[in-house]
Structures are given as C-alpha cells and as structure tokens.
C-alpha cells in the first residue's frame, strides 16, 4: 500500500457554536450525512459533535487533494465508529467515485478534541 494523501484540520468549537446560533440547523444539514444528522439531533453535545465531524470532513477533503468542490460535498463523507469505537469514514456520491478512481483501499482517521478545539487527521492509502 502507498499513501495517497494526508489531511489535517482544526476547528474552533466556539466558531461552530456561533454559526449555529446565527443560522440554526443549516450548517449541520449541509455538513452531516443522514445518519450523522439523526445522531446530532439527539446528541448530548451537538456543537462538539458537529465540530468534530466538520474537522474530519475538511481533513478528508485535504487528503484527497480536492477540497470541497467539483461535486464533492461535506455530507458525502460520513464519520462513524467501528465496534471498538474507532472513527472511520464511509463515502457516498462523488466522494465514493473519486476514491474508486484513485484506487483508495484504506482510510485512517484520528480525531481529538479539547475544551476549545476539535482536530482531525485523515490518511488515505491505495
């Protein structure tokens, strides 16, 4: 296997909170997949949940070398936890097509948050 890309992102949690205060659920609707949306709606820390998902998706877009453009959207990158609680990525739509085109066979996700920040790193392998 070879590393195709590496992306890292850091999000100020207060910034996400500010956007939610101004625009309600619009940011969450744009960023989250349907499965993530269902979790967010009942999560005990919805702002922190959204900030962490946003960081992973930005990191993934950077790892793919594309950013969020040309048909790619945040909600095409879905963060979920495996049976051990490890964060993983599931792709949909154009993100999945891009991964198939690039020959992606594995994606590694690491995620951390502290009081003020959430950060994530994504590595993609072929």
From Swiss-Prot:
Catalytic activity entry: apo-[ACP] + CoA = holo-[ACP] + adenosine 3',5'-bisphosphate + H(+)
Domain of life: Bacteria
InterPro entries: 4-PPantetheinyl_Trfase_dom (IPR008278), 4-PPantetheinyl_Trfase_dom_sf (IPR037143), ACPS (IPR002582), Ppantetheine-prot_Trfase_dom (IPR004568)
Gene Ontology CC: one annotated term: cytoplasm
UniProt GO molecular function: holo-[acyl-carrier-protein] synthase activity; magnesium ion binding
Protein's UniProt keywords contain Lipid metabolism: yes
GO biological process terms, semicolon-separated: fatty acid biosynthetic process
Keyword Cytoplasm: yes
Entry's EC annotation: 2.7.8.7
Stated family: Belongs to the P-Pant transferase superfamily. AcpS family.
Role this protein plays: Transfers the 4'-phosphopantetheine moiety from coenzyme A to a Ser of acyl-carrier-protein.
NCBIfam families: acpS, pantethn_trn
The protein's name: Holo-[acyl-carrier-protein] synthase
Taxonomic lineage from the root: Bacteria, Pseudomonadati, Pseudomonadota, Gammaproteobacteria, Enterobacterales
């Amino acid at each position: 296997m070879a590393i195709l890309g590496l992306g890292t992102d850091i999000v100020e949690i207060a910034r996400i909170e500010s956007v939610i205060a101004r625009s309600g659920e619009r940011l969450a609707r744009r960023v989250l997949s349907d499965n993530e949306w269902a979790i967010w709606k009942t999560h005990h820390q919805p702002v922190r949940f959204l900030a962490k998902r946003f960081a992973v998706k930005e990191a993934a877009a950077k790892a793919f070398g594309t950013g969020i453009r040309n048909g790619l959207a945040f909600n095409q990158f879905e963060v979920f936890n495996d049976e051990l609680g490890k964060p993983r990525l599931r792709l949909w739509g154009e993100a999945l097509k891009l991964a198939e085109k690039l020959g992606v066979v594995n994606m590694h996700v690491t995620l951390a948050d502290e009081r003020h920040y959430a950060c994530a790193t994504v590595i993609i392998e072929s």
